[in-house]
């Protein structure tokens, strides 16, 4: 990469309106790191980690550059998806519940992303993300498995891909 391309994420463009750049959608040109993280959220939609309309709905209620509105609006759409996931699971609509849990997990991740390390909302937001991820994994056929391991006195959660993709599916 040339020197100009090295820091595209941090570049504030002359065009102050939301627009497309060669590296993707630039929602808030004056706030490139928020625009970058929003672009990541849009990217998750192709794998079911959100919907374009929900991402745009959340963004439409955010104040450019305001990380409080960022957290609030992602929490709002995440909570709505988590509730719908619970309701759909109780009604026996497993696939819809799974979709809602997966979207909620990603939206909670978005909500947590710009919180300061000592923000008291960080752990509860992360815990909601983890709970939705676990519900999604539990509803897979066969169910996904969460493995917990200790490493340097910190606990990390790992997803066992062997449980998500049985060996007969990918080993020749």
For each predicted feature, which ranges?
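N-terminal cap/lid segment of alpha/beta-hydrolase-fold proteins
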Residues: 74, 78-81, 123-167
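An N-terminal hydrophobic leader/cap segment in hydrolases
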Residues: 40-57, 108-147
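Long, non-catalytic architectural segments outside compact domain cores
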Residues: 1-70
């Amino acid at each position: 990469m040339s020197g100009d391309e090295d820091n595209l994420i941090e570049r504030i463009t002359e065009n102050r309106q939301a627009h497309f750049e060669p590296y993707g959608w630039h929602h808030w040109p004056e706030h490139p790191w928020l625009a970058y993280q929003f672009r990541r959220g849009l990217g998750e939609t192709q794998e079911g980690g959100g919907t374009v309309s929900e991402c745009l709905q959340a963004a439409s209620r955010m104040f450019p550059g305001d990380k409080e509105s960022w957290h609030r609006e992602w929490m709002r759409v995440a909570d709505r998806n988590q509730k719908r996931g619970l309701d759909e699971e109780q009604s026996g609509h497993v696939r819809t519940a799974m979709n809602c849990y997966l979207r909620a997990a990603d939206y909670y991740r978005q909500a947590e992303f710009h919180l300061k390390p000592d923000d008291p909302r960080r752990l509860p937001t992360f815990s909601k993300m983890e709970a939705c991820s676990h519900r999604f994994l539990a509803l897979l056929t066969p169910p996904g498995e969460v493995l917990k391991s200790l490493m340097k006195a910190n606990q990390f959660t790992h997803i066992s891909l062997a449980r998500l993709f049985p060996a007969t599916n990918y080993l020749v």
